[in-house]
Design a protein with these regions (language model features):
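Accessory C-terminal segments flanking Radical SAM cores
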Residues: 188-265
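A short local structural element in Rossmann-fold oxidoreductases
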Residues: 25-28, 104-105, 127-128, 225, ...
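Conserved, mostly hydrophobic/aromatic
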Residues: 16, 20, 24, 64, ...
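Radical SAM enzyme [4Fe-4S]-AdoMet core and its adjacent flexible, acidic
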Residues: 120, 125-217, 231
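Radical SAM/AdoMet-radical enzyme domain recognition
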Residues: 41-64, 68-168
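Canonical Radical SAM [4Fe-4S] cluster-binding loop centered on the CxxxCxxC motif
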Residues: 4-42
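Short, well-ordered alpha-helices that flank and scaffold nucleotide-derived cofactor binding pockets
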Residues: 29, 52, 80, 84, ...
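N-terminal [4Fe-4S]-dependent radical SAM core
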Residues: 1-13, 23-25, 56, 250-265
Length: 265
């Protein structure tokens, strides 16, 4: 469906949990963020209902995010549910990969098409520093398992102020050797004084934005930087989605106080 500015909105990002097993320095504080109560998090059946309705309205792509989506117990069951939704052409996931290895085959069998794996360095010590608690061996095992399962794999590398050119070159060589894609993303603050660098890949400009977000608590967010949140009315899901699309601004705010961990992936 089209928004008020003529953009075709056909991409739904679904945060299945606000929990994460890592504490990446650019994403959330070391002590984490205030977590939702379990009873406030959407059930798989509720997520499926929203996705089915979105598909009937013309949405064609769904991406599961978090938090860390694989931290949600039984997420492979959710993938299988969504994999059966008629009209959804692409079912994807963004993950840190550390819990992916034992689940990759089941996720692919359930209908997952692709994974974006966050991997900012190949150096074990730096990986531990950046994630505060992660083991790079787990992430690399996840990459290999995803490839073996037949999933399309893309690495997301956040390039920070102290990232050496040699690290970027090493990651490019690693991705090329695995036959997978690499996207480098400039570390961006949501504050105006630190914008993305044009040297690296960037999110699509507002004029080409085709997505809305469903947060883990059932809130629909039409824009990454938006302060307008709409709770899904499960007696009128179509109306809720339509209202979120209509509320999508022509462009996002110049700055925001939200952290990366608070914007639903």
């Amino acid at each position: 469906m089209r928004d008020a500015y003529g953009r075709e909105i056909d991409y739904l990002r679904v945060s299945v949990t606000d929990r994460c097993n890592l504490r990446c320095r650019y994403c959330m504080p070391e002590d984490g963020i205030p977590l939702l109560a379990h009873e406030d998090i959407l059930s798989f059946e509720q997520i499926e209902a929203v996705v089915r309705t979105a598909a009937r309205m013309g949405f064609r792509k769904v991406r599961l995010t978090g938090g860390e989506p694989l931290a949600r117990r039984g997420v492979s069951d959710l993938v299988a549910m969504l994999g059966r939704v008629r009209g959804i052409e692409t079912l994807a996931m963004t993950t840190n990969g550390t819990m992916l290895a034992p689940l990759a085959a089941a996720l692919a069998a359930g209908g997952l098409d692709s994974v974006n794996i966050s991997l900012d360095t190949l150096d074990p010590a730096r990986y531990r520093y950046l994630t505060r608690r992660g083991d790079i061996a787990d992430a690399l095992e996840g990459v290999d398992a995803a490839i073996a399962a037949g999933l399309a794999v893309k690495l997301n590398m956040v390039v920070m102020e102290d990232t050496a050119d040699a690290e970027i070159a090493a990651m490019r060589d690693f991705a090329a050797g695995k036959g997978i894609a690499l996207q480098t993303i400039s570390r961006y603050s949501l504050q105006a004084q630190k914008g993305d660098s044009a040297e690296y890949d960037r999110p699509p400009p507002c004029s080409a934005c085709n997505r809305i977000r469903l947060l883990a608590n059932g809130v629909l967010r039409s824009c990454l930087h938006s302060d307008i949140d709409m709770k899904v009315d499960f007696s009128d899901i179509e109306g809720s989605i339509a209202a979120a699309v209509r509320s999508k601004p022509v462009h996002g705010a110049v700055s925001s106080t939200k952290s990366v961990g608070q914007i639903g992936g």
